């Protein structure tokens, strides 16, 4: 049975995610930006938090761990490579490790670039991937610690997941990301459609998260770096995928 997913808006533009396994009663939180909305959502659902999964060390993803842990006693899971700058970990993770939430398990994927110790969690049985600030809706995270080559390798790993996978990322930056994507590919019908759907979601008060990987492959300029039309759009028709990705990232930084 697939896990139940609840997206929890936090802070100004962060997302946390709750995953619930009805059979076992276990519930996981992915990232901890803010305690109050998470604890309120747990109470409203009647779920008991058992696990906290952390994608990376930035404060807006971990700062509520102490309060949430104190309230719930949940086990904390995070990257072994970043243990020195994460809250105390009960389970230090490396690539390929698994985290069980009831009968379902997440596979840990190393995705350096935004930070060196960034990880993602892929739940293949539920077709879910929690990508933090690596792969984002129509975008990717800034390269605060990693290189373009590292981030491109990370995005390539995520792009190889099944296309029906729901990508759950850490922020709502979608309006700006789509404007940038459309500046590069103004005639992309998938982008035009996605912008229209986003406008509808905003009008109806629906959260624009998650999106399928198939939608990202059709609209996310960073994942589209290998395509001839994207290489032409940035004036690098013969360049490597990594070089094209780096150019797109540099342009987005200034957009």
UniProtKB/Swiss-Prot annotation:
Binds 2 Zn(2+) ions per subunit. Thiolesterase that catalyzes the hydrolysis of S-D-lactoyl-glutathione to form glutathione and D-lactic acid. Pathway: Secondary metabolite metabolism; methylglyoxal degradation; (R)-lactate from methylglyoxal: step 2/2. It comes from Fuscovulum blasticum (Rhodobacter blasticus). It is an enzyme of class 3 (hydrolase). GO terms for molecular function: hydroxyacylglutathione hydrolase activity; metal ion binding. Its EC number is 3.1.2.6. Monomer. Keywords: Hydrolase, Metal-binding, Zinc. It holds the Pfam family Lactamase_B. This is Hydroxyacylglutathione hydrolase. Its cofactor is Zn(2+). Zn(2+) 2 binds at residues 60-61, 133, 171. One of its GO terms (biological process) is methylglyoxal catabolic process to D-lactate via S-lactoyl-glutathione. The keyword Thylakoid does not apply. HAMAP family: Glyoxalase_2. It catalyses: an S-(2-hydroxyacyl)glutathione + H2O = a 2-hydroxy carboxylate + glutathione + H(+). Zn(2+) 1 binds at residues 56, 58, 114, 133.
């Amino acid at each position: 049975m697939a896990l139940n997913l609840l997206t929890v808006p936090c802070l100004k533009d962060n997302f946390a995610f709750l995953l619930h396994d009805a059979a076992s009663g276990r519930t996981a939180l992915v990232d901890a930006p803010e305690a109050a909305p998470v604890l309120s959502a747990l109470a409203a659902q009647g779920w008991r938090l058992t696990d906290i999964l952390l994608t990376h060390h930035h404060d807006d993803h971990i700062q509520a761990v102490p309060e949430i842990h104190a309230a719930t006693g949940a086990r904390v899971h995070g990257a072994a490579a970043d243990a020195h700058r994460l809250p105390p970990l009960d389970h230090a993770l490396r690539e390929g490790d698994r985290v069980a939430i009831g009968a379902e398990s997440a596979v840990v994927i190393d995705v350096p670039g935004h930070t060196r110790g960034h990880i993602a969690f892929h739940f293949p049985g539920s077709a879910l991937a929690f990508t933090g600030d690596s792969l984002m809706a129509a975008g990717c995270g800034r390269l605060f610690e990693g290189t373009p080559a590292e981030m491109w390798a990370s995005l390539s790993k995520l792009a190889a997941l099944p296309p029906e996978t729901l990508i759950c990322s850490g922020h709502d930056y979608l309006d700006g990301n789509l404007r940038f994507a459309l500046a590069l590919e103004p005639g992309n019908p998938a982008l035009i459609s996605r912008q229209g759907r986003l406008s509808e979601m905003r009008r109806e008060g629906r959260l624009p998260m998650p999106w399928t990987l198939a939608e990202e492959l059709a609209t996310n300029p960073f994942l589209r770096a290998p395509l001839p039309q994207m290489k032409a759009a940035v004036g690098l028709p013969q360049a490597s995928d990594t070089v094209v990705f780096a150019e797109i990232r540099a342009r987005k930084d200034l957009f």
